[in-house]
Amino acid sequence: MSRVTLSRYLIEQTRSNNTPADLRFLIEVVARACKEISHHVSKGALGGVLGSMGTENVQGEVQKKLDVISNDILLEANEWGGHLAGMASEEMDNAYQIPGRYPKGAYLLVFDPLDGSSNIDVNVSVGTIFSVLRCPNEYLSQNETLNENAFLQPGTEQVAAGYAIYGPQTMLILTLGNGVKGFTLDRELGSFVLTHENIQVPATTAEFAINMSNQRHWEAPVQRYVGELLAGETGPLKKNYNMRWIASMVADVHRILTRGGLFMYPRDAREPSKPGKLRLMYEANPMSFIIEQAGGASTNGYERILDIKPESLHQRVSVILGSKEEVERVTAYHKE
């Protein structure tokens, strides 16, 4: 039986699920960009791409060379095809305008070009996270200047989301709103090939991912929940748990997606005015969409991530996602 490439899968989705041709083309272009990013990541020190740029992004985070390279690759790959009305990125203060010499399309692309890039110099898995939204009608005019308001849609409005993980293998995880598929890059073939047909997050788990060094700063519900996990079989949950923390959201969530668990990056007391560390639009929303489509759940502790109405492009949020039963337990603790 012949292998199913990403292109073939998307064509079949167009035939069977009425996936628009423009959306199919957009996903293929993003996938090609991810292949190019994977190539740069894999060269490491040999390609002169490691280290810092000496600049900061809008979040005040030091930009790695590969942050900027990956951002440029995604912009250049997607700006000319006529399928996008605009783009937004972790690495840019404002929305990216499609150059006037190119036609505009019906979609918006939001992305973190290289999640986990602080780990790139130590050869830890990193990745690209992306989200696709429909552009509101009032911004579809060729001459209309796009501003961030076009992007401020709740995660329930996403039409597609995915991430590429650059590890021992390069994989693309994708949802079009009808389940989650996994594609592995066949470097000899030069294509992403369907290798994981119907990814499901196990409902229960014995693993969790959180940065324990921040424990003293967490809110009481998170303190309580993690304390119960650490108590193991002698505690109220009557089960031993293992902790895993890679400090790369793509890597941590990918592990949870494939074998179950709970990923937590809660708000803490050091910056009370900030509701969390991770960005809603291009980290929490796409990952939450994927996790929910795989049978898991995602919350900020008080409400479903996908129901949050964004107020700004780079809005931060507390994130707790993964196996459904555990997410529901943490949510219940927050509501007591």
Swiss-Prot record:
Pathway given in the UniProt record: Carbohydrate biosynthesis; gluconeogenesis
Residues binding Mg(2+) 1: E90, D112, L114
Keyword line: Carbohydrate metabolism, Cytoplasm, Hydrolase, Magnesium, Metal-binding
Top-level taxon of the source organism: Bacteria
Assembly mode: Homotetramer.
NCBIfam families given in the database record: PRK09293.1-1, PRK09293.1-3, PRK09293.1-4
Protein name in UniProt: Fructose-1,6-bisphosphatase class 1
